[in-house]
Structure formats: C-alpha cells, structure tokens
Amino acid sequence: MELTRRQMLLGSLAAAGGAVLAGCGAGGGSAAGGGAGTTAAAGFPVTIEGKLGTATVPQAPRRVASVGYTDHDAILALGVAPVAARYWYGAENTVVQPWASAAARALDAAPAVLTMSSIEPEKIAAQRPDLVVGVYSDLDAQNYPVVSAIAPTVGPAKGFHDYGAPWQEQTRLVGRALGRTDEADRLVGELEARFAAVRDANPQWAGKQVAVATRGADSLSVFASQDPRSRFFTSLGFVVPPRYDELAGQSFYAELSFEQYAELDHDLVVWDQLSFTPGGRATVERDPLLSRLPAMREGRAVFLEGGTELAFAWQTVLSLPAVLDAVVPALERAIPRA
C-alpha cells in the first residue's frame, strides 16, 4: 500500500513491536457485555457539536463503530465494546493494541476491522451502528454527510486543527456520546494527576524547548504544538517553539529540508517514527548534519522505538500510562535534576 505523507506522519502501517490481543481480526463485532445501553439513559438525548456538524444521540448507544484511528481506545476505556474499529498502526489487521488488550478482553470485544486508507461507508453500515465515533479521523466535508446518514456521528472536535484534539477532549467527547461523562472525567482526572506528579518531580523541564521530529528518506518533519505528540511534552513542562506553528500553518506538522536541520536546535530533540526512517536510529545518529546538533552531541536526544513508538503514536487515555513508564526515565537522563 502506498502511503501519503500525512498517513506516514500519522504513523500508519509501522510494524512496531509488542504482543497483541488474540482474536481481534476482521469479522462481525460483538457488543456483548459492553453496550452503552447497560447504563442509565436519563441523560439522553445528547447533542454534540463538532467541526463538521452536530450529532444528536437519542438514547444510550448499543453498537458503536469507531472510524477514528485511535478512538476505540477511549470507547474501550469507558467500558464499551466497539463493533468496528479502524486499523492504523502496528501488526496488520490488528486494531486492539497491547495497552488496550485487558479492557478488550474484559468486554469480549472483537471489532470488525476498517481499513486505514479511507472511510468505508459500506463496511460501517454493515455493522448496523447506532453511533459512529471519528474524533481522531479523516472525516471531512465530503464523507461526513455520508457517514452521519448511517448513524449519529461524532466527528473531529471544534477548536482544534485536524488531528489536533488532545486525549482529554477525545475521552470526554466519547464519554458524552456514550452517556458516561462521569467515568470519562474520572479517567481524565487520574491520568492528568499522573502527568502533574511527573512534572512536579522534574521542575528542571519547565520552559525547556522541545522538538518532536522525524527523519524520512528525503526530508525532516517536526510536529506543531497542537499535535497530541507535542502536547505530551508540554504536559510535562516543556515548550514547543512558536516557530514550528508558523512553519506548519494549519497542519499538524512542518516539513523541513535537511538543510534546515538547525530548526531542531533546542534543549531536547525527540526522534519519533524511527520505524519509517531507513536504517532507523543509527541513520539519525550518523547523519552528518543532525549529529551537529548540540542536543545530539550532549545526550539531550530521546529515541522512540518499538513498542514505545507505537504507544506514543496513539496518545490515548489507555496508551499514555505505558508511554510515561517508558519515556520519563529517558527524559530524566537527557535533562536530569540538578
């Protein structure tokens, strides 16, 4: 499958490491034990305004299809088994990743697999959903009306760039649509408290500038401040240089030529999506231009590989605890406490 630049930067099709939940392949989904209809319906109907339109959910949904690349994590975290989920990253045709496997197993979730490359209205309709979730998705002005005609559709959030809504917004939007706002708030609060604890324990990171970058075969890229991957570091006290937003415009990333490598000259450089870099980490470390960066020479570079790269790409309420476990020690080595 040929990847567009956007799909590559989103992280599609990387064969990152990690065990996956057995049995989560294509086929009919099951909502057994996980339908949102098992909760009280007093809060319905629910109306949610999005960037592309308004979704009115008349009653607690029982068959939820996820067309967002990562939205099924929030659905699972809130105790609902999606009947369909979008493939994005990792082992091919696997939509439940290691950090979500326990939640999926508890719900007996076996979602039908929707392809990464495009929205598939026929496959969505075949699952007979009464709610479609596509917060972190490629829903747009052309395909949103088609999908929303199948079932009420919660699309990209208002007030954010494409693919820019943070995990908190994603979790709370899904919680509202499922009638589980209290549970969504609880999940968000617990994870935010963990970020705060790490931030408080590492005051040396406050105000330090970070570049979250990738190295492709022909160019470099850096994520803008609204991208969830950059938000991960700002949640820990780091700052994304305003220059990156200028370069990115309305996109979630800015593409740089190799000659622009000095744009990455900041306190911390984080190398992401190394599974797409020909030769991986070694290529970055040996690059004659990138190796000139002070952060590279002085040990202030962090490399996200394997299962960590995979979890970091997701940026969800379920994946982020694993990311914190893996990345915080590396950050403490790169910029240690005085």
Label for each model-derived stretch:
Residues R128-G134, P152, H266:
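Proline-aspartate-enriched helix->loop->beta-strand connector
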Residues H72-K123:
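A short, structured surface patch at a secondary-structure boundary
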